[in-house]
Amino acid sequence: MAKKPKSNDKALAQNKKARHDYSILSTMEAGMVLTGTEIKSIRDRRVTLRDGYVQIRHGEAILMNVQINEYLQGNQFNHDPFRNRKLLLHKKEILKLQEETKNKGITIVPLKMYLKNGFAKVLIGVAKGKHEYDKRESLKKRDQQREIDRALKNR
């Protein structure tokens, strides 16, 4: 039996609530400017993306309200868990995000944080908020699909 090819992407944190509360229009990968203790905490999976969002300020994309807990062995050189972090994107990508968020009800949310070739990356998504009935409808569709999959599996 052949070995599976080893994937370089290792998901460290996911924002499942974002996929429930928003319909994702497009996604984009971005790097982050981090300190030493932040990357160590990320590798320990001590990250919360739930309330995070991205703002475009002065031509820079900034990841806000994402909690990266303090590194346990970090002593006096530890970081602030809620500090704003600059995202590393090309100028064209930032301008594209800025144009897309000009529409009412459109926001940018972090969906997933992972390591890629040793570097921490965040998958951000341009999203539009769902109404309550949209959320119920998507739950209903997911349950129906699950039932269909179970029925086909048990055949």
UniProtKB/Swiss-Prot annotation:
Keywords: Cytoplasm, RNA-binding. The keyword Cytoplasm applies. The lineage of its organism: Bacteria, Bacillati, Bacillota, Bacilli, Lactobacillales. This is SsrA-binding protein. Required for rescue of stalled ribosomes mediated by trans-translation. Binds to transfer-messenger RNA (tmRNA), required for stable association of tmRNA with ribosomes. tmRNA and SmpB together mimic tRNA shape, replacing the anticodon stem-loop with SmpB. tmRNA is encoded by the ssrA gene; the 2 termini fold to resemble tRNA(Ala) and it encodes a 'tag peptide', a short internal open reading frame. During trans-translation Ala-aminoacylated tmRNA acts like a tRNA, entering the A-site of stalled ribosomes, displacing the stalled mRNA. HAMAP family: SmpB. It is found in: Cytoplasm. GO terms for biological process: trans-translation. Belongs to the SmpB family. Residues 134-155 are annotated as: Disordered. Coiled coil: none annotated. InterPro entries: SmpB, SsrA-bd_prot, SsrA-bd_prot_CS. The keyword Cytoplasm applies. One of its GO terms (cellular component) is cytosol. Pfam families: SmpB. GO terms for molecular function: RNA binding.
